[in-house]
Swiss-Prot record:
Binds 2 heme b groups non-covalently. Keywords: Electron transport, Heme, Iron, Membrane, Metal-binding, Mitochondrion, Mitochondrion inner membrane, Respiratory chain, Transmembrane, Transmembrane helix, Transport, Ubiquinone. The chain crosses the membrane at residues 33-53, 77-98, 113-133, 178-198, 226-246, 288-308, 320-340, 347-367. It is found in: Mitochondrion inner membrane. The keyword Lyase does not apply. Heme b b562 binds at residues 83, 182. It comes from Ellobius tancrei (Zaisan mole vole). GO terms for cellular component: mitochondrial inner membrane; respiratory chain complex III. Its cofactor is heme b. GO terms for biological process: mitochondrial electron transport, ubiquinol to cytochrome c. The cytochrome bc1 complex contains 11 subunits: 3 respiratory subunits (MT-CYB, CYC1 and UQCRFS1), 2 core proteins (UQCRC1 and UQCRC2) and 6 low-molecular weight proteins (UQCRH/QCR6, UQCRB/QCR7, UQCRQ/QCR8, UQCR10/QCR9, UQCR11/QCR10 and a cleavage product of UQCRFS1). This cytochrome bc1 complex then forms a dimer. Heme b b566 binds at residues 97, 196. This is Cytochrome b. Belongs to the cytochrome b family.
Amino acid sequence: MTIMRKKHPLIKLINHSFIDLPTPSNISSWWNFGSLLGLCLTIQILTGLFLAMHYTSDTSTAFSSVAHICRDVNYGWLIRYLHANGASMFFICLFLHVGRGVYYGSYNMIETWNMGIILLFAVMATAFMGYVLPWGQMSFWGATVITNLLSAIPYIGTTLVEWIWGGFSVDKATLTRFFAFHFILPFIITALVLVHLLFLHETGSNNPTGLNSDADKIPFHPYYTIKDFLGALLLLATLMMLALFFPDALGDPDNFTPANPLNTPPHIKPEWYFLFAYAILRSIPNKLGGVLALILSILVLALMPFLHTSKQRGLTFRPITQTMYWILVADLLILTWIGGQPVEYPFIMIGQVASIAYFTIIVILMPIAGMIENNILDMN
């Protein structure tokens, strides 16, 4: 078996990636989220496949087909709620994975980091289109509001929006194409994940100290396979608890009402995992400015390798930047809260302050803190 594992052209690839892969001996549970994201993607593709067997992407039957899945299909309710809450688990793991990368300076592996940003955009696009498919009130109005943002692009904006809609409003053509894209994108994401791993295995994993770990590597299997398995069990337990006990806790009550173009919901808002970006979008009075800020809220991550001023890689031994980091985390939680609030005083002002703070911490304060820490080290 050992000979086959190391010689067979296909099994050899798996062996080098998941079995004999030299891994730092000191990586903590924060390094579990990569494998958990792989598990989330697998769950989403499988549950999505079974949902697609019963779903119809037609405006007149989409809503009732989802109701049919929940009422008449064997365990359809479970598949639907695993898929809906699986998306939430996916984003929780994504945010923790990115947060770990920022904290421990993993963004210095530029190819892997940039691939991760592309993946983040792809997953966000997939989740947005998936939210439109049940064709409830929030699905319809969410799709209308978010796609309409593209009309802010000078000269070609309006034409572009109508091209995406397939008409003069969000309608049958829009739903059909969103379903097609929502189906194909997870497979594209799977291919991108393989590229992400390819880049990662070129450099090897980072570790909590931020030091070179070549002198102290251990094989991935059995040490980290068993560790990842424990993480997977905890993730599945959490997902099952969500899907079975609180299936609609993270959803919007408006989505229990079929889409009606003549009736606008009082507060249009996306799913909870987009609220931070939605708050940044709404905090700028200008439409184009808001769209740019929305894109930059994610794209600013690509600047992190160039804004790294410290002589140390991670934040493990850097108390000033650590403080900045946790203020940034708190700021993102505030933005998430604001994104779900109505557009009125004092929420508008809080959103604007939190949005300015978000970009200021990443672009200005963290690099300055890194330089201050360098000087303190030099003095000693």
